[in-house]
């Protein structure tokens, strides 16, 4: 059965068998027991273990499973539902541990649609966690800058907090298809930042036009969450870039908290390929 994936070596279609993906040229990629394939050639890795590690994967899964970001998930589901035909092809690029990918897939199926979805991430531990969530999605370890996808293959591309690979997104998205780019809003985790830093500053908010895409809308998502225990606070901290660049004193202040109430703020930028 022909899959959504293309061979990362020669670009030919990959057929999915019971245990491996294979292309007509004979290149073969085993399917791990969790259900994902490794489609990241050595020349695209740039490090021995690219992307987030196993601890980061566990922190994300634990935090997101408690519903703290469900408002963002539900808003994404509504937007993608309104943009989708009966059998949409959707790629979640830099999908992380698959929280949004799986939620969107299940929403579309529940609405009577027949989505074909792929989730890719450069981190093997993160992708392994994602593949356990939903067997109906095609999962692969792959670079966002070298997607194992055919030209014009996707109706919708989703990028949540991952690096932009605009040239590749233009290649993979069909004309008229939609690209959803999720970024933190100005006040995202403001109260967390007040604990970590002496002089926190809001995230920049701007509309950036991208060549080959028309801006369609920006959807704001705003909420306040309360983390009732240090374990959840630490899990959230691990999910953020602040985990790697916070002064020791700020990290110690956060570790001393027994609870934290903080704003969450997101922007969903919606583009359409020209």
Task: For the regions a language model picked out, list residue spans one by one.
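N-terminal auxiliary segments of SAM/dcSAM-dependent transferases
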Residues: 1-49
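Conserved Class I S-adenosyl-L-methionine
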Residues: 2-3, 193-213, 221-274
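Class I SAM-dependent methyltransferase Rossmann-like catalytic core
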Residues: 46, 51-75, 79
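Class I SAM-dependent methyltransferase SAM/SAH-binding core
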Residues: 89-91, 97-146
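A short acidic, Gly/Pro-enriched loop at the edge of an enzyme's catalytic core
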Residues: 145-156
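Helix-to-beta-strand junctions that scaffold the AdoMet/dcAdoMet cofactor pocket
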Residues: 173-174
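Conserved beta-strand signature within the Rossmann-like core of class I S-adenosyl-L-methionine
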Residues: 177-184
